[in-house]
Regions:
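Solvent-exposed alpha-helices and their adjacent loops that cap or buttress functional pockets
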Residues: 72-74, 103-105, 127-128, 145-149, ...
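Active-site/ligand-binding-proximal alpha/beta "capping" segment
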Residues: 158-210, 254-258
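Acidic/glycine-enriched connector segments
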Residues: 118-176
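Short gly/pro/ser/thr-enriched loop/turn and capping motifs at secondary-structure boundaries
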Residues: 141-146, 183, 211-214
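Glycine-rich beta-alpha loop segments
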Residues: 2-137
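Catalytic-core regions of core metabolic enzymes
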Residues: 51, 55-58, 203, 208-211
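C-terminal functional extensions of proteins
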Residues: 206-261
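Structural motif
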Residues: 77-80, 109-110, 132-136, 152-154, ...
């Protein structure tokens, strides 16, 4: 369509008043902040609250991804193990975590955890004591204690979503020990990513039938039974109490992946 047909008699709409802020165009009544980008950057007398604005946060988020990718790019094949930060060192689940970490190390896998205390520490410790490679991806929290001493390679994150990307990208499998909301968050995100084929299928092991059995039964009865997922979706979960069985599932899945790549 020609301009003449859109605007007969040569009557064109008046060009709106506009201001430019870098690549952003402000037109009509869009308010300007009254200064240029360079001025706000170079003027040391100005306010410093600009570092807390959303555009600046984007750069910080980008930096987290760059730092995470750079730090983890050379990590050997790894398995992420989730579990509660509240697990005490004298609790049976702590010793279980140590054994799982050691078993994964013996099988040639690096272990990756959230890097915190409790079950995470136990897994890192077990892998470290067995001579394996132990990775911790920490998160900035008001009550965070920092990375546990059994981490060989640690990366701290401000943002959960950047950290979760690293867990998925650099893991061959997830093993979930008894845990709280954080463990559940990671569990269901992994299931969703695999179900929707956003990531290559990898196993999600629920370790501890007494703890996870109720959740598994609810998914089978209510979620699958109600037609909210397909039958194959339930197969994404493997429920076990046996360390050798958990490691076997991980090894078989990794071997199947290797055979196709």
């Amino acid at each position: 369509v020609s301009e003449q047909s859109e605007f007969p008699d040569g009557q064109y709409p008046e060009r709106p008043v506009e201001r430019h802020k870098g690549p952003v165009v402000l037109r009509r009544d869009r308010r300007d902040q009254g200064s240029t980008t360079d001025q706000r950057l170079l003027d040391s007398r100005g306010p410093s609250d600009w570092v807390h604005t959303d555009p600046w946060r984007v750069l910080r988020i980008q930096a987290e991804f760059v730092e995470g990718f750079g730090a983890l790019a050379e990590v050997p094949r790894a398995v992420t193990v989730f579990g509660s930060a509240r697990t005490k060192r004298d609790h049976p689940e702590y010793e279980l975590g140590r054994k799982i970490g050691a078993a994964l190390a013996d099988a040639g896998f690096a272990v990756m955890t959230g890097g915190g205390p409790g079950a995470m520490e136990a897994v890192n410790r077990g892998a470290n004591e067995a001579g394996g490679f132990s990775v911790g991806l920490g998160i900035e929290l008001p009550f965070e204690q920092g990375l546990n001493p059994w981490v060989d390679l640690g990366v701290n994150f401000r943002y959960f979503f950047a950290r979760k990307t690293m867990f998925v990208k650099y893991s061959q499998a997830f093993i979930c020990l008894p845990g709280g909301f954080g463990t559940l968050d990671e569990l269901f995100e992994a299931l969703t990513l695999v179900q929707t084929k956003k990531v290559t299928k990898f196993p999600v092991v629920l370790f501890g039938t007494e703890y996870w059995g109720g959740l598994y039964d609810w998914i089978a009865k209510s979620v699958l039974g109600g037609g909210k997922i397909g039958e194959k979706d339930l197969d994404l979960l493997h429920l076990t109490d046996d360390i050798d069985d958990a490691v076997r599932v991980v090894q078989e899945s990794y071997q199947a992946w290797e055979d196709t790549h």
